[in-house]
Amino acid sequence: MNAMQPPQSVEEIKAGLETTEKGGVRQSIRNCLTVFQRDPLLSGAIAYNILTDRKDIIKPIGFHRESTALNDTDMKYLLLYLEETYGLTNEKKIDNAIGIVANENKYHPIRDYLSSLVWDGTERIRFCLRHFLGADADDYTYEALKLFLLGAISRAFQPGCKFEIMLCLVGGQGAGKSTFFRLLAVRDEWFSDDLRKLDDDNVYRKLQGHWIIEMSEMMATANAKSIEEIKSFLSRQKEVYKIPYETHPADRPRQCVFGGTSNALDFLPLDRSGNRRFIPVMVYPEQAEVHILEDETASRAYIEQMWAEAMEIYRSGRFKLAFSPDMQRYLKEHQRDFMPEDTKAGMIQAYLDKYTGSMVCSKQLYKEALNHTFDEPKQWEIREINEIMNQCITGWRYFPNPRMFSEYGRQKGWERENPATDSGNPSEKTMDGFVEVAEQMELPF
């Protein structure tokens, strides 16, 4: 089958339609399909929009329309046209033919847009967030925005590809953070900020047809539980959803990416293991070269060329949808600026800065660093201390084989990476009550 066969005149089409034994036009899908493929008004008019997962009418067909999406009013006009012109009246057969001809005439508006762009050679990704929002023009900001753009392009050309990153613009109330994401989506219908519930059965409907989705309200009210829900949501690559008029549910691979905005600096709950999915960029509107709405036409032109630059990188294939290991380490440290102060980690670090022994254990830190002299730690408190030592404290190395502590018995713990004692004598008893024994020391018996 070919949905784009050369148009014919109405009389030629009528002459070629299948007829009944009595000479009337046969009410068949084949006849309806022939009309949609060859009628001078309808040929090439109906297409399947891969982005919206809907049928569109993509050229004028003789009556006024408000949008491209095929709707109930359009169907009434089409039924009337096929009845009056060809005597085709079976609504179900006509609808089936529309489904077939649309499926044979697919298009993706974002792919078409991106593929049409030609870069002028001027670098903009590195300076964009500085230009519009006053962010630092450093390597981190450049890599953050570049990664987000490449993720968006990849999701358009490869729906459902793995991309778990959320670019978060932080600070600067009234700076234009939400407007930046809206203009980044190029067309307003490709942008949405209407995602409110992540556990909604109809969440696919909120994503459908959108490319850039801003999470503003959720980031503003985020807590430890909701952040975990957002992280889980970001990791999904598809939704399973049954459109009301369809019989069976189907996988709907994601074609969108998610951006976050927050006026509060400490929008990330404390997470010592890191929130690798969230990439925060601080904005300073007073340092911006231009407000993004000062000249919207110029801003859109700038952003369009930025997409063209990103497409050059995408076409080259020389990229990964993840930070480099060095940038990942920087991100982990940088994220701490956007979390509440970690008071327990600070207390443990202060204790270790003054401590002269060569090893410590969780119970020791609980009692001596966190000042629980007469209490016994609960299991979750032990896990929290372990997390602090393993994720936040440097200069100490974990040992898994229990050693003897004079006050706390046999315990797993941490030793200095460069052990130090008061006198330098390896056999001298340290403050933790443990006697260091040199590996090659001759035993006195």
Go through each PLM region and give its residues.
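Feature primarily recognizes SF3-like P-loop helicase cores of small DNA viruses
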Residues: L80-H108, K162, E189-D193, D199-L234, ...
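Residue-level preference for alpha-helix termini and adjacent loops
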Residues: P40-L41, A45-I50, D56-I57, G62, ...
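P-loop NTPase catalytic core of nucleic-acid-dependent motor ATPases
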Residues: I98-Q208
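N-terminal nucleic-acid engagement/recognition segments and initiation subdomains in replication
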Residues: M1-R124, D139, E143, D375-E376, ...
